[in-house]
Amino acid sequence: MDGSGEQPRGGGPTSSEQIMKTGALLLQGFIQDRAGRMGGETPELGLEQVPQDASTKKLSECLKRIGDELDSNMELQRMIAAVDTDSPREVFFRVAAEMFSDGNFNWGRVVALFYFASKLVLKALCTKVPELIRTIMGWTLDFLRERLLGWIQDQGGWDGLLSYFGTPTWQTVTIFVAGVLTASLTIWKKMG
């Protein structure tokens, strides 16, 4: 958990294919959950419900709890609402690159990337640009493959997320949210 580069802590599958497959399931589930909380059924997403194994369900629950906490942070929501999405690809890749620009990788930033992608998808839903939804998911998975895959493998696969957060206590989640908020403030100030 200290990032010292010791043995992988997650203990999950670490093949590139399995990490990308699990990442896609987690991203899709996270976006469906966020959209569902916005207003019930969202057939416009065009995403089918995919059965998850026990490990993926645990990961999804962890992401949902963190997403709930981020949703309740009004300052973060205000900043996200202010993001201009006229050129969403540029915005997505600028924010994603900025999140990891210092070379420090951690699960909080990976979750922040998923959260940002979900917010862009929800904006696309609200502005009735449904073709953008799969595109944003594709950008997120491309970024994951190109920039984060090796790091996730080094952490022992996606199960490293659970090792990192464990069963998040309110204190852990609050510290995490404060970190994401600080990073997000920096990102959006630079974009402004």
Swiss-Prot record:
- Kindly state which keywords UniProt assigns to this record, in alphabetical order: Acetylation, Apoptosis, Cytoplasm, Isopeptide bond, Membrane, Mitochondrion, Mitochondrion outer membrane, Nucleus, Transmembrane, Transmembrane helix, Ubl conjugation
List modified residues, type N-acetylmethionine: 1
Motif BH1 extends across 98-118
Question: What GO molecular functions are on record for this protein?
Answer: BH3 domain binding; channel activity; lipid binding; protein homodimerization activity
Q: Where is this motif: BH3?
A: 59-73
Chain segments annotated as transmembrane: 172-192
Provide GO CC annotations from the record. Answer: BAX complex; Bcl-2 family protein complex; cytoplasm; cytosol; endoplasmic reticulum; endoplasmic reticulum membrane; mitochondrial outer membrane; mitochondrial permeability transition pore complex
A GO BP term here is: extrinsic apoptotic signaling pathway in absence of ligand
- Cross-link entry Glycyl lysine isopeptide (Lys-Gly) (interchain with G-Cter in ubiquitin), positions: 128, 190
Q: Pfam families under this entry?
A: Bcl-2
Per UniProt, the short sequence motif BH2 occupies residue numbers 150-165
Q: Which domain of life is it from?
A: Eukaryota
Q: How is it modified after translation?
A: Ubiquitinated in the absence of XRCC6/Ku70. Ubiquitinated on Lys-128 and Lys-190. 'Lys-63'-linked polyubiquitin chains on Lys-128 are removed by USP12.
What this chain does, per the entry, is described as:
Plays a role in the mitochondrial apoptotic process. Under normal conditions, BAX is largely cytosolic via constant retrotranslocation from mitochondria to the cytosol mediated by BCL2L1/Bcl-xL, which avoids accumulation of toxic BAX levels at the mitochondrial outer membrane (MOM). Under stress conditions, undergoes a conformation change that causes translocation to the mitochondrion membrane, leading to the release of cytochrome c that then triggers apoptosis. Promotes activation of CASP3, and thereby apoptosis.
Q: What is said about the domains? A: Intact BH3 motif is required by BIK, BID, BAK, BAD and BAX for their pro-apoptotic activity and for their interaction with anti-apoptotic members of the Bcl-2 family.
Entry similarity comment: Belongs to the Bcl-2 family.
Subunit and partners:
Homodimer. Forms higher oligomers under stress conditions. Forms heterooligomers with BAK. Interacts with BCL2L11. Interaction with BCL2L11 promotes BAX oligomerization and association with mitochondrial membranes, with subsequent release of cytochrome c. Forms heterodimers with BCL2, BCL2L1 isoform Bcl-X(L), BCL2L2, MCL1 and A1. Interacts with SH3GLB1. Interacts with SFN and YWHAZ; the interaction occurs in the cytoplasm. Under stress conditions, JNK-mediated phosphorylation of SFN and YWHAZ, releases BAX to mitochondria.
Q: What is this protein called?
A: Apoptosis regulator BAX
| Organism name | Bos taurus (Bovine)
- Organism placement in taxonomy: Eukaryota, Metazoa, Chordata, Craniata, Vertebrata
